[in-house]
Amino acid sequence: MKLFLCSHFSSVGSLIKEEIDNKKVAFIPTASLREGYTGYVGSARKLFNKLGATVTEIDISTEAYLTIQSVFEDADVIYFTGGNFFFLMDQLRKTGTDKLLKKELEKGKLMIGESAGAIICAPTIQYIEQMDEKPEDYSQEDDAGLDLIDFYVLPHYLTAPFKKVTEKIMTEFSDLNLCPINNRQGIVIDGEGSKVICKD
């Protein structure tokens, strides 16, 4: 399974430019739809274009399943923006896109997860609840994540405006295998394991 998980894609995406150049990218901004600030969505879009990708944007919360399936099957890379991780995970499970995603990843496609998109890869997303509110219309009975990795990404570590909350999560969930990353770091996961890489 190939994953690239980060806090802020436009700051570190160039580290994997060879994985993006000339590739078809399914761009999922769904997590950002409930957020006030969404500047990171536009900056990610710009970087993909700069790196030579062909981008198809699709919102899994409103699009028909067959359309999502078609876009995912056609893509080389599947990218999830940051935003509200509970809303994103709810929509993934509600629409069946979670199973669709796993099927495509089994084919060797690359998933890029930024912030919320990285958090959802863990076995559960409950550990990160202090960073964002659970929507009132959250429809799941539990806080299960995609369970693609056996550790828990803590994005924006010691980075404003998340400095205090990330410190608190590190302390309160010290029993979990947390992997804190700042906005200049990314985690590369492949068949050989995982490693943190950094943008100078």
Pin down the residues of each PLM region.
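N-terminal beta1-alpha1 cap of cysteine-dependent amidohydrolase-like domains
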Residues: 1-77, 81
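Short amphipathic alpha-helical segments
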Residues: 17-18, 39-40, 90-93, 124-126, ...
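Short glycine-rich anion-binding loops that position phosphate/pyrophosphate groups of nucleotides
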Residues: 33, 83-86, 117, 158
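Hydrophobic anchor at the start of a short beta-strand
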Residues: 55-56, 111, 194
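Short, active-site-adjacent cap segments at secondary-structure transitions
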Residues: 86, 118-121, 186-188
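Class I SAM-dependent methyltransferase SAM-binding "motif I" and its flanking Rossmann-like core
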Residues: 90-91, 97-159
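Conserved anion/nucleotide-ligand pocket segment
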Residues: 144-149, 153-191, 197
